Design a protein with these regions (language model features):
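Terminal, contiguous helix-loop blocks that mediate binding/assembly
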Residues: 2-488
């Protein structure tokens, strides 16, 4: 869950996609004090500054919930601060020896020691600052959970671990919507979680609202719904919910495949019904076209070769959407989250659908005005299960990034045929895109946000899944123009 402020904070709830999304945020930071490059993004909306031992920290303003054992090598209070009481790097004085030495007990102490979780290769490369080595790792086949590709460090207050249920890679133990409801209502969890929310709210100057991501098919849906109910009652802020459907489904503990399919269906139905009550707007996300009893029909993206059931790949696609879509309320001169939700939930219809073009299929030497004039077909692919998004009678919020004003149209002296087009009068990318949607979508309204800066992608983003038609600047290579006309 994210806390939004303007600086306006947004408080975030978590799922695996969220960690790729937060990685994007940190990749766009500029740590060079002599740099003259100015960012269009206000990072204070999702991040907070703090101090520890006179050192400045900058961490996501968020709360995450996961099961016991999911953190693997990460301590339950996070890895932002070094534990000063234990000499972790001293091989002659292990953690176990230090703990034994600190206990005033005469008798022999019985020790039950769990096997230490191995540190993933990517995390080892980060800790040793071998960034180039991290780029060469086969992350697609080695990553199984979000700590494996975590780049950002989190405040101890952000981490909430469920003690009653244990994480398993091959099955899900927190199974039903009702189990999630009961978990949130347990005294230890609700008190700790709500105290952490309150702490973030108290340090915020002007909280816009809450941005929530969670798995909709298991017990975390119940946890999330109770969380939203609490936030709605306690704070009366805008709540933007993004229920997520994974690309493949684990069976639940003590349930066979048929029973697990039925449980997922019921969990999803309960989730959608309750989100209509407690969220200002919710948008289901998945790279699968069908996510009801069965989860299948992977979406196709013309320039992306991804493995549909690989969480590392699918989370990168959804995080790309979230990072781009959220720019509307994360820019320095942006509107509020409440404005987005109000515009899209017309007639109090709380559910919306999403689509993405990854990347935008414009040629690297082409102007936007020429691209829009020649393009035919669907520009974007739906990433909401069961939703085929039409073009007529729709309300939409569109964000386009990476096209500088110099690529809008030719200068007047070399414009030639462009001068005959109605769009030549447009003075900005957003204005030209707005005109495009007015002309191509009947009885529709579109709000367009345009950002010149491209999405900065670095390891651990799976850059290898873009095919060779994409240039290093993110545009389609010029010689491929005939292949991409009409593709979205």
């Amino acid at each position: 869950m994210s806390f939004l402020e303007h600086s306006s904070e947004i408080i975030k709830n978590f799922s695996a996609i969220f960690f790729v999304y937060i990685n994007f945020q940190e990749h766009s930071f500029n740590y060079d004090p002599e740099s003259t490059e100015s960012s269009e993004i206000n990072h204070d909306i999702l991040f907070r500054e703090g101090t520890h031992n006179r050192n400045i920290t900058y961490t996501p303003r968020m709360l995450l919930v996961d099961l016991k054992g999911s953190l693997k090598y990460i301590p339950e209070d996070g890895n932002l601060y070094t534990n000063q009481q234990l000499e972790l790097n001293n091989p002659e004085n292990s953690v176990l020896d230090q703990v034994r030495g600190s206990i005033a007990w005469d008798d022999e102490i019985e020790v039950m020691e769990a096997e230490e979780a191995p540190v993933p290769d990517y995390q080892k490369a980060l800790q040793s600052t071998e960034i180039e080595a991290a780029k060469n790792l086969n992350l697609k086949d080695s990553i199984s959970n979000w700590p494996d590709f975590m780049y950002t460090r989190y405040h101890p207050r952000s981490i909430n671990i469920v003690k009653e249920y244990e994480y398993h890679e091959e099955m899900s133990s927190l199974d039903t919507f009702s189990a999630g409801l009961k978990l949130f209502e347990s005294s230890y969890f609700e008190d700790d979680f709500c105290d952490n929310v309150r702490s973030y709210m108290e340090e915020s100057n002007h909280c816009q609202g809450f941005q929530t991501l969670f798995d909709a098919v298991d017990g975390f849906s119940g946890v999330a719904v109770k969380c939203l109910e609490y936030l709605q009652d306690e704070y009366s802020k805008t709540i933007f919910a993004l229920p997520l459907i994974p690309p493949w489904a684990k069976n639940f503990q003590f349930a066979d495949e048929a029973m697990s399919d039925s449980i997922r269906l019921i969990n999803t139905a309960f989730t959608y019904a309750k989100l209509s009550e407690h969220a200002s707007l919710f948008v289901p996300l998945s790279t699968m076209g069908r996510a009801w009893r069965a989860i299948d029909e992977p979406r196709k993206f013309p320039f992306v070769s991804y493995e549909p059931t690989n969480l590392y790949h699918s989370s990168a696609i959804l995080a790309s959407f979230l990072d781009t879509m959220s720019l509307r309320y994360r820019l320095k001169d942006s509107s509020f989250l409440s404005t987005l939700c109000t515009e899209l939930n017309g007639y109090n219809r709380k559910m919306a659908a999403a689509k993405i073009s990854l990347p935008f299929p414009m040629n690297e030497k082409e102007d936007l005005i020429d691209f829009l004039d020649r393009f035919e077909g669907e520009m974007m692919e739906s990433i909401t299960p069961g939703a085929k998004i039409g073009t007529d009678r729709v309300l939409q919020s569109v964000t386009l990034r990476g096209i500088p004003k110099t690529r809008l149209k030719r200068p007047l002296e070399s414009a030639k045929n462009q001068m005959k087009m109605a769009a030549f009068k447009c003075g900005s990318v957003s204005e030209m895109m707005q005109l495009y949607y007015q002309c191509s979508n009947y009885a529709s309204l579109a709000h367009v946000t345009a950002v010149e800066g491209r999405m900065k992608i670095k390891s651990p983003f799976p850059m290898e899944f873009f095919d060779n038609r994409i240039a290093s600047n993110g545009f389609v290579k010029e010689f491929q123009s005939a292949d991409v006309n009409g593709e979205g």
